């Protein structure tokens, strides 16, 4: 690992001292920071709920803003060096405006309240009562996942939900460390990274970038919340460039470490890199033999998203496969992985009748587990799906045909209008997480072009595969092009999926520049 990556890893892991208790003489900012709340009065702050004035104009808006300033001290007070809100009233808003910053603060709230931190006047780094239960009737509201996410980002986008639950119990102080450079935003809650460089969307005008500057705002929403030790470090252009470069290097290093297989299809069917066997195989009777291009699976030089590609010109039975050993890492205790590929086809014009599975993960018996991407056979346009089928009695206790099971009773994600075409490549990523795990909930996620499409959750995902028989299979009844296949040994995060989607030269960027083909 390079020195810059090591230094950035240390930087991410360390949360320099924010005072654990109120200190005599007021807040004491760490080196390079300044206090934006003096612990004594409301100097430097005013009241503003931007939502209440957003649609007003002229004198009505002027009167509203004036009234909010007047109402501010009615709902905010100073107590023991803490800035305290009663749960209502306008938001505490800094007179000063900020651009690229690192913000550190502490907060403590009560049950059934929520709040948030607006950056550049834009919502928000979310604060939840994380004890609230998930309501399936409001699926985009997920307080049970914890605080720190960019709640006003588009549902399913990177950073909207926190990566881990990091909240402390009620009655204890929580510590936020928030860094924002441009729209890229990192959030640490209680020293845990919950948002990793995600882009904060402009809630007010989503088609435009985040404003260059704006105030910091502390939201009021339904219950008392206390704030203390609010410190800001303003990040200059040179420092911002250094941080972004180090973050990019660190992100690629994490992905490189997780990579287990990469097949660029630039020279043929075999993988360029593998922790296990690079050879691509095909089933002949009971044997696996080395796969070679033929009339059913052609090598198409310069036809790929990055260089060459595989072309499946017609529905066939020749299915290139990669062995698991060291690649997928299937095991009977707790299995997680991610698979990435690019596809190009028009499903409604190119595919022949019947189901089509461009990628499968299979074992010794499909009734003991079966994972696949598929296009449906009867709908127009065809639905695109990602399915994880565990042991047969779990998902199909009534022994029905797959097509006869109601869609909401299938362990799958379905996309009615997926963005596939002959003219453009579509990036597909699917993850498996905690398969066979008896303690942690299993999850499977589907992403298209870097965006989350849905998740398979609340299923018993017990498999019964023989690990020695597990295969990654390509092109079952598939007609179209495929490029840049990759496997990772863990579920990628939303932001990591977005990153590999944006790689200019494909997965090879994760390893070739530093270590050569492995």
Give each language-model segment a name.
Residues 22-251, 257-261, 271-274, 286-288, ...:
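Carbohydrate-interacting regions of secretory-pathway proteins
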Residues 441-444, 483:
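Repetitive beta-architecture junctions, highlighting loop-to-beta-strand starts
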Residues 8-19:
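Bacterial N-terminal signal peptides
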Residues 279-287:
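Low-complexity, Gly/Ser/Thr/Pro- and Asn/Asp-enriched, turn/coil-prone segments
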Residues 1-7:
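Positively charged n-region of N-terminal signal peptides that target proteins for export
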């Amino acid at each position: 690992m390079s020195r810059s990556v090591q230094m950035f890893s240390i930087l991410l892991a360390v949360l320099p001292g924010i005072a654990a208790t109120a200190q005599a003489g007021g807040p004491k900012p760490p080196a390079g920071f300044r206090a934006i709340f003096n612990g004594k009065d409301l100097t430097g702050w005013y009241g503003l709920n931007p939502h209440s004035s957003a649609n007003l104009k002229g004198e009505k808006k002027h009167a509203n803003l004036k009234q909010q300033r007047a109402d501010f001290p009615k709902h905010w007070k100073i107590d023991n060096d803490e800035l305290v809100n009663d749960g209502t009233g306008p938001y505490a808003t800094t007179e000063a405006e900020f651009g690229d910053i690192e913000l550190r603060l502490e907060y403590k709230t009560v049950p059934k309240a929520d709040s948030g931190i607006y950056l550049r006047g834009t919502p928000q780094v979310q604060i939840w009562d994380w004890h609230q239960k998930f309501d399936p009737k409001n699926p985009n509201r997920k307080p049970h996942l914890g605080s720190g996410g960019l709640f006003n980002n588009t549902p399913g986008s990177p950073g909207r939900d926190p990566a881990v639950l990091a909240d402390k119990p009620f009655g204890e102080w929580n510590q936020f460390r928030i860094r924002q450079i441009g729209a890229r935003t990192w959030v640490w809650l209680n020293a845990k990274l919950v948002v990793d460089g995600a882009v904060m969307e402009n809630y007010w005008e989503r088609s435009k970038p985040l404003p260059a500057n704006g105030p910091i705002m502390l939201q009021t929403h339904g219950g008392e919340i206390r704030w203390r030790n609010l410190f800001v470090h303003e990040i200059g252009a040179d420092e911002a460039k250094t941080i972004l470069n180090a973050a990019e290097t660190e992100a690629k290093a994490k992905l490189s470490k997780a990579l287990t297989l990469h097949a660029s299809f630039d020279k043929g069917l075999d993988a360029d890199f593998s922790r296990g066997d690079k050879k691509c195989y095909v089933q002949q009777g009971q044997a696996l033999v080395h796969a070679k291009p033929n009339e059913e699976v052609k090598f198409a030089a310069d036809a790929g998203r990055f260089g060459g590609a595989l072309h499946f010109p017609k529905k066939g039975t020749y299915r290139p496969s990669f062995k698991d050993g060291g690649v997928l890492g299937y095991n009977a205790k707790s299995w997680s992985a991610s698979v990435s590929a690019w596809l190009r086809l028009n499903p409604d014009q190119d595919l022949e009748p019947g189901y089509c599975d461009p990628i499968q993960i299979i074992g010794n018996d499909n009734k003991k587990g079966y994972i696949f991407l598929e296009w449906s056979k009867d709908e127009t346009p065809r639905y695109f799906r990602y399915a994880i089928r565990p042991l047969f009695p779990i998902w199909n206790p009534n022994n029905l045909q797959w097509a006869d099971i109601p869609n909401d009773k299938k362990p799958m994600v379905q996309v009615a209008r997926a963005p596939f075409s002959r003219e453009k490549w579509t990036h597909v990523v699917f993850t498996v997480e905690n398969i066979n795990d008896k303690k942690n909930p299993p999850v499977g996620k589907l992403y298209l072009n870097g965006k989350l499409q849905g998740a398979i959750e609340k299923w018993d995902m017990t498999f019964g595969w023989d690990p020695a028989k597990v295969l990654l299979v390509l092109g079952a009844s598939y007609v179209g092009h495929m490029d840049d296949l990759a496997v990772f040994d863990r579920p990628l995060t939303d932001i990591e999926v977005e990153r590999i989607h944006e790689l200019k030269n494909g997965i090879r960027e994760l390893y070739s520049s530093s270590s050569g083909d492995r």
